[in-house]
């Protein structure tokens, strides 16, 4: 039986009594860019947060059903959510490097706090992660500087390096280019093509055009349900549902 990077089974998510994710069944293959697209408020960011148990931090949120990572239900009582978040990293919409830490420390912090490396080994991990995020050549001579003077795109790649340093299996990205200029956006989109060789990328985007450019598979979410899911080219060029066609052509926002 094929093992998927992420599989959901009858996933339902509530904020209080409001059901925002309504019985979603989804299978995300390994080593792809998988886009979740849909209008604002459709539930795509909530769904993304269920994939690494970030919703645990919201006392209003309740999760029912299963989310399986490499075959294991991460909502089982014996699963450590800290370990889940180590294996499933998250990049948020607003670039959020720690302003009080240097560029080096921003990449190293997760590794240090988890006791995974120190000394020269830590130096090598930081260098490797910055190279992997295509940022090393831009910052290698200012690792002791603070990130305030980095561009928005550089800050977001620094955050990606911080995630990579933890050696995750999956990287979740919640509209990672929404607040970045076109040059920075292009660099991050190019980076996704490289990262999917080693990781599974799940990308929330408000832009159908971006989903079409960078993803291998796409799910269109509307009012908490999946309307259509499949290979990106098929969904955009030959959608099965009228709602999907309206969304990808800009008639539904």
Curated annotation (Swiss-Prot):
Its main location: membrane. ATP binds at residues 38-45. Its EC number is 7.3.2.1. GO terms for cellular component: plasma membrane. Gene3D superfamilies: P-loop containing nucleotide triphosphate hydrolases. GO terms for molecular function: ATP binding; ATP hydrolysis activity; ATPase-coupled phosphate ion transmembrane transporter activity. Residues 6-248 form the ABC transporter domain. It is an enzyme of class 7 (translocase). GO terms for biological process: phosphate ion transmembrane transport. It is found in: Cell membrane. Keywords: ATP-binding, Cell membrane, Membrane, Nucleotide-binding, Phosphate transport, Translocase, Transport. Belongs to the ABC transporter superfamily. Phosphate importer (TC 3.A.1.7) family. Part of the ABC transporter complex PstSACB involved in phosphate import. Responsible for energy coupling to the transport system. NCBIfam families: 3a0107s01c2, PRK14267.1. The complex is composed of two ATP-binding proteins (PstB), two transmembrane proteins (PstC and PstA) and a solute-binding protein (PstS). This is Phosphate import ATP-binding protein PstB. It comes from Pyrococcus abyssi (strain GE5 / Orsay). The lineage of its organism: Archaea, Methanobacteriati, Methanobacteriota, Thermococci, Thermococcales. The gene is pstB.
């Amino acid at each position: 039986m094929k093992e998927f990077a992420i599989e959901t089974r009858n996933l339902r998510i509530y904020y209080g009594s409001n059901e925002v994710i309504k019985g979603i069944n989804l299978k995300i293959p390994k080593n792809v860019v998988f886009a979740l697209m849909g209008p604002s408020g459709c539930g795509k960011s909530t769904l993304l947060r269920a994939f690494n148990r970030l919703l645990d931090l919201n006392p209003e949120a309740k999760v029912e059903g299963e989310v399986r990572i490499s075959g294991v239900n991460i909502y089982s009582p014996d699963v450590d959510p800290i370990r889940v978040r180590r294996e499933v990293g998250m990049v948020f919409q607003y670039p959020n490097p720690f302003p009080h830490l240097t560029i080096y420390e921003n990449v190293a912090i997760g590794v240090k706090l988890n006791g995974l490396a120190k000394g020269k080994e830590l130096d090598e991990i930081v260098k490797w992660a910055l190279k992997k995020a295509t940022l090393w050549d831009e910052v290698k001579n200012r690792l002791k500087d603070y990130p305030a003077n980095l561009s928005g795109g550089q800050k977001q790649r620094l955050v990606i390096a911080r995630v990579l340093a933890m050696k995750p299996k999956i990287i979740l990205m919640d509209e990672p280019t929404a607040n970045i200029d076109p040059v920075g956006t292009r660099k991050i989109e190019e980076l996704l093509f490289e990262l999917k060789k080693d990781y599974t990328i799940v990308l929330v985007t408000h832009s159908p055009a971006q989903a079409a450019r960078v993803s291998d598979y796409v799910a269109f979410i509307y009012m908490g349900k999946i309307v259509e899911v499949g290979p990106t080219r098929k969904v955009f060029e030959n959608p099965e549902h009228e709602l999907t066609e309206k969304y990808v052509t800009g008639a539904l926002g």
